[in-house]
């Protein structure tokens, strides 16, 4: 599969529609990523967004005609606002690749995960994140969250090095 990486700098909403559609697909299937469109679009525009596209022959790489595989929207301080990978492409290393890119660019990487989202928590722990605290009523719907942080610099370096191979 031909995979193209694109980066959308803060202040742009390039590819926001494709990211929204992927987020909504995941929300409908898994009851996570429940943010409203306005909140999502605003956060997307304030973040640097790393996107992975599966190329469609004859299309411009990373264009809206390509299929969005996944994306990570990250604040300047390394806080991951959104991480989403198309369910049909999970287990293929795309989430790790996105997070390795984030780890390469930030000294500290943190995020929240819905406490009931066991798949996300398992993923984050597998790549070296540690649960730092549990927060009740974190989400608008009253759902609890875990605050996670990528372990010390050694783990960040190892994750980045692992993904460069």
Label every model-predicted segment.
Residues 104-117, 135:
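Conserved GNAT acetyl-CoA-binding A-motif
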Residues 6-90, 96-101, 159-165:
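Acetyl-CoA-dependent GNAT
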Residues 97-110, 123-126, 130:
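Conserved acyl-CoA
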Residues 79, 84, 110-112, 147:
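Conserved beta-strand segments that form the floor/walls of ligand-binding pockets within enzyme
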Residues 69-70, 133-136:
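A structural microfeature
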Residues 14, 118-119:
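Short alpha-helical
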Residues 114-118, 137-165:
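C-terminal "cap" of GNAT-fold acetyltransferases
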